[in-house]
Amino acid sequence: MREEAMKKQGVLVAPSIMGADLACIGREARNIEESGADLIHIDVMDGHFVPNITFGPGVVAAINRSTELFLEVHAMIYTPFEFVEAFVKAGADRIIVHFEAAENIKEIISYIQKCGVQAGVAFSPETSIEFVTSFIPLCDVILLMSVHPGFCGQKFIPDTIERIQFVKQAIQVLGREGSCLIEVDGGIDKESARACREAGADILVAASYFFEKDSINMKEKVLLLQGEEHGAK
């Protein structure tokens, strides 16, 4: 049922729970669901691959109990293989691992999929985008970091647009349109979202923009990120 949400036409919006009020994470998960967002992005950080430390399987399980939305774990950790089973048991519907985090990434992708969930690979901004080509036939999603991984509130890196275009073209050449999605994570707001959509992005991850307290409510922000310029009623 949750996987059907990934087949929806148009750009999917994935609020990152890292930007939420973590004192009431269950309520925030429900707020995301009520906003009309398509999935919840859960940033898992180990303090080694990136300097920040965030969530483990227990938090994923708590979010899973609070929502029916598709849950995506973005594993910014070394030795991701060791944690796959725990995150699957906690309720993850997709696990994304970093190209830079291990040498046996293709093995890890295969193992994630054998565990019955979707798999993806993330690429940091400084990593050559040409490495992506060999992963497109294997993955459900390619995630392009549009900031340096680790913290919310960073500015969108403009070079990401060319990287999206490269991946989009590679997906078309390899006949994987609709089977391998392009996800962009970092610095996403109304303006950068528009540029990403035009370049070919399928999923946009938003943290600071989505959760900041301002005059635009969450439902309106989802529509703006999707390209509905008039916002929600």
Curated annotation (Swiss-Prot):
Example of a GO MF term: D-ribulose-phosphate 3-epimerase activity
InterPro entries per record: Aldolase_TIM, Ribul_P_3_epim, Ribul_P_3_epim-like, RibuloseP-bd_barrel
Domain of life: Bacteria
Binding residues annotated for substrate, in chain numbering: 16, 74, 150-153, 185-187, 207-208
Keywords from the named record: Carbohydrate metabolism, Isomerase, Metal-binding
GO biological process assignments: carbohydrate metabolic process; pentose catabolic process; pentose-phosphate shunt, non-oxidative branch
Cofactor note: Binds 1 divalent metal cation per subunit.
Residues that hold a divalent metal cation according to the record: 41, 43, 74, 185
GO cellular component: cytosol
The UniProt record lists the keyword Isomerase: yes
Function: Catalyzes the reversible epimerization of D-ribulose 5-phosphate to D-xylulose 5-phosphate.
HAMAP family per record: RPE
Family of the protein in this entry: Belongs to the ribulose-phosphate 3-epimerase family.
PANTHER family in the record: RIBULOSE-5-PHOSPHATE-3-EPIMERASE
Protein name: Ribulose-phosphate 3-epimerase
UniProt lineage: Bacteria, Pseudomonadati, Chlamydiota, Chlamydiia, Chlamydiales
Name of the gene this protein is made from: rpe
